[in-house]
């Protein structure tokens, strides 16, 4: 019996990953750190911005109902084509390797503003009672375009965040997941359409509070964490850099993907983003500059690479408006993955059988790899996060 137990312990020791103490964490690359030491080496020697991974665009979006899509197509065929995509539930996306999620939110502090979509009424659709009940509750709602493109895998922000948090709890070693948010408040030219409430500083205060109602601050890479004791967030990013990969595994960072007045409203007079939950898409000359949305991978390639090499975190897109999928055109995808942008967003982690084989995934089946513009030789071709 003791012999069997001893054999079992020996087998466990032989197959378990090496402890950090057994690894050469000052080795020049992950492969030289010792047997089973790549993870420990990367966690200590790579920073959050030293990676590249794939995520999804408008991650919450379900397909527009056929009758409403037909109505849109009658008046604007090209717009209808651009809206003709959808996603599987967030949990399934994460299981498939997505490490960036995009959520569009509308402000609905009293509830009920989006409970009765005009498009559904116009074409005679009867919505499930649970939809109206859910949308009647106070809080931020998640949708693409009010009244016509309103279906979501998680109709409320809290539901989306709870799903992300639950997945993270079951997979605590994941690389930091980027959650970008669009704050939607544009009107649309549709009969009977809702007029969205505008995003002012009070609305953004409520948005931060709703995020913190689900995620504790210690599970979020906040601007304050990155800034530390530097005068500005930009100074911290360019002079010291982002936290290490090891310090950010199992965590999330949130970014407000907006410009101009919305960024000003979110900052609310702050020098950088002191006390805020989200980073903002601030221009490089802003004290709050740290994260940038540069979506045009074909034309912004040099800009993306330059900013990544400086130390900024960048999100770009592999495809848009179903164009690349319909044409099976991989040029934008390939440019995006090679540009250095840390988070590359797609609507097609899996192909859409209606269009063809186009999809956007990390090479070699990786979930995340060393960033191609930040000394990728350090990873020696090994994954930062392996296939799920």
At which residue positions do the language-model features occur?
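Bacterial N-terminal signal peptides
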Residues: 6-16
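Catalytic cores of phosphodiester-bond hydrolases, prominently lipid phosphodiesterases
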Residues: 20-388
């Amino acid at each position: 019996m003791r012999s069997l137990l001893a054999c079992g312990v020996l087998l466990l020791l032989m197959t378990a990953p090496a402890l950090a103490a057994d690894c050469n964490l000052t080795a020049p690359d992950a492969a030289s750190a010792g047997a089973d030491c790549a993870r420990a080496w990367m966690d200590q020697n790579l920073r959050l911005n030293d990676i590249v991974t794939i995520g999804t665009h408008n991650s919450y979006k379900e397909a527009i109902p056929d009758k409403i899509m037909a109505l849109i197509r009658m008046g604007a065929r090209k717009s209808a084509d651009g809206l003709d995509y959808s996603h599987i539930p967030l949990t399934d996306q994460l299981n498939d390797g997505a490490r960036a999620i995009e959520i569009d939110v509308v402000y609905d502090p009293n509830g009920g503003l989006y409970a009765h979509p005009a498009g559904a009424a116009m074409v005679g659709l009867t919505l499930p009672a649970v939809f109206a009940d859910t949308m009647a509750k106070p809080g931020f709602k998640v949708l693409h375009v009010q009244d016509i493109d309103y279906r979501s895998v998680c109709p409320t922000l809290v539901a989306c965040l709870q799903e992300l948090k639950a997945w993270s709890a079951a997979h605590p070693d994941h690389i930091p997941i980027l959650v970008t948010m669009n704050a939607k408040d544009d009107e649309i030219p549709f009969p009977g359409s809702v007029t969205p409430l505008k995003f002012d500083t009070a609305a953004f205060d409520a948005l931060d509070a709703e995020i913190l109602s689900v995620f504790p601050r210690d599970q979020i890479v906040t601007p304050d964490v990155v800034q530390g004791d530097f005068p500005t967030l930009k100074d911290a990013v360019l002079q010291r850099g982002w936290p290490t990969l090891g310090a950010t595994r199992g965590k999330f960072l949130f970014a407000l993907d907006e410009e101009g007045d919305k960024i000003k409203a979110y900052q609310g007079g702050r020098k950088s983003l002191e006390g805020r939950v989200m980073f903002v898409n601030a221009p490089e000359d802003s004290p709050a500059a740290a994260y940038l949305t540069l979506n045009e991978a074909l034309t912004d390639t040099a800009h993306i690479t330059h900013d990544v090499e400086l130390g900024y975190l960048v999100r770009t897109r592999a495809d848009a408006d179903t164009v690349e999928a319909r044409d099976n055109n991989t040029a934008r995808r390939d440019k995006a993955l090679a540009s250095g942008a840390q988070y590359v967003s797609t609507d097609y982690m899996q192909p859409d059988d209606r269009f063809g084989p186009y999809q956007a995934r990390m090479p070699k089946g990786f979930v995340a790899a060393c960033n191609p513009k930040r000394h990728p030789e350090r990873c020696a071709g090994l994954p930062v996060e392996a296939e799920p």
